[in-house]
């Protein structure tokens, strides 16, 4: 990719830029205390051979895709046209186009939803989309019923079964939760799924009080019996540790710049922000959170 980026500069291909403002308390270089701000090119995002390129217009997208394929060809590789997809984020057109670019006379599919590294991305949902939550729930439930003979076997101690649940099922339910920006409805679905599994594992978990629809065991009581962590608490803890880790990273780190994103948002309503969500839950100011993160108090 280093060769591709160098060639992109020579061909004047422009990638998407994003603004950032790192608070002074989080600046770890010699400019500590002065703040750090600017723009950064999102020239590429990738893991192994799974690459993401971001452009502001179709012209640069087309040039970048052709140049990427040319660069790979020079090294005995090529772009897999069948697996390559495009997506228009926040598309304002009423009719979402099925394709917007070609490569070697083959149309590249333009999708509304794409799965990248196990997570679903939706073209017009700035926060964690419902497709991602549906996928997480389906994945967790499939694993739960796959192991149902063990997880719902009362002859096995509950503590052992809960440990198996958290290790093999909850890990699927909360996969990549460190970067989630959920609304209250989505969080309730995650919690409901987890407690529904606990009810199946605990004897008389679905028993109701006489003449009412109320369960004998509330969710809180289920948690006490199982001696496990509430899913909301688990997700919050994961996000707090992740954000604190990013705060301690070098100021040049792209993750740190993305965490303190300062792009203008023109969409009405509350702007989803992992940084604001985490600091808001800790009941402390952003500066206090940064100081605790640097001191590794989290």
Each language-model region and where it sits:
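Short linear motifs embedded in intrinsically disordered, charge-biased segments
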Residues: 3-298
């Amino acid at each position: 990719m280093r060769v591709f980026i160098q060639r992109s500069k020579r061909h004047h291909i422009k990638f998407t830029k994003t603004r950032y403002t790192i608070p002074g308390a989080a600046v770890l270089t010699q400019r500590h205390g002065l703040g750090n701000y600017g723009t950064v090119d999102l020239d590429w995002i990738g893991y192994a051979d799974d690459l993401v390129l971001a452009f502001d217009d179709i012209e640069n997208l087309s040039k970048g895709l052709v140049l990427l394929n040319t660069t790979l060809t020079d090294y005995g590789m090529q772009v897999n046209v069948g697996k390559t997809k495009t997506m228009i984020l926040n598309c304002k057109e009423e009719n979402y186009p099925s394709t917007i670019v070609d490569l070697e006379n083959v149309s590249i599919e333009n999708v509304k939803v794409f799965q990248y590294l196990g997570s679903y991305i939706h073209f017009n949902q700035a926060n964690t989309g419902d497709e991602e939550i549906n996928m997480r729930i389906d994945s967790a439930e499939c694993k739960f019923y796959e192991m149902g003979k063990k997880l719902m076997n009362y002859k096995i101690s509950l503590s052992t079964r809960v440990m198996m649940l958290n290790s093999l099922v909850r890990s699927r339910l909360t996969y990549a939760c460190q970067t989630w920006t959920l609304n209250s409805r989505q969080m309730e679905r995650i919690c409901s799924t987890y407690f529904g599994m606990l009810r199946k594992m605990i004897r008389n978990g679905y028993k109701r009080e006489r003449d009412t629809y109320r369960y004998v065991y509330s969710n809180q009581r289920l948690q006490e019996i199982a001696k496990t962590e509430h899913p909301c608490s688990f997700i919050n803890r994961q996000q707090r540790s992740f954000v604190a880790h990013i705060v301690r990273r070098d100021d040049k780190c792209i993750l740190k710049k993305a965490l303190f994103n300062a792009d203008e948002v023109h969409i009405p309503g509350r702007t989803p922000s992992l940084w604001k969500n985490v600091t808001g839950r800790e009941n402390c100011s952003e500066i206090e959170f940064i100081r605790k993160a640097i001191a590794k108090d989290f």
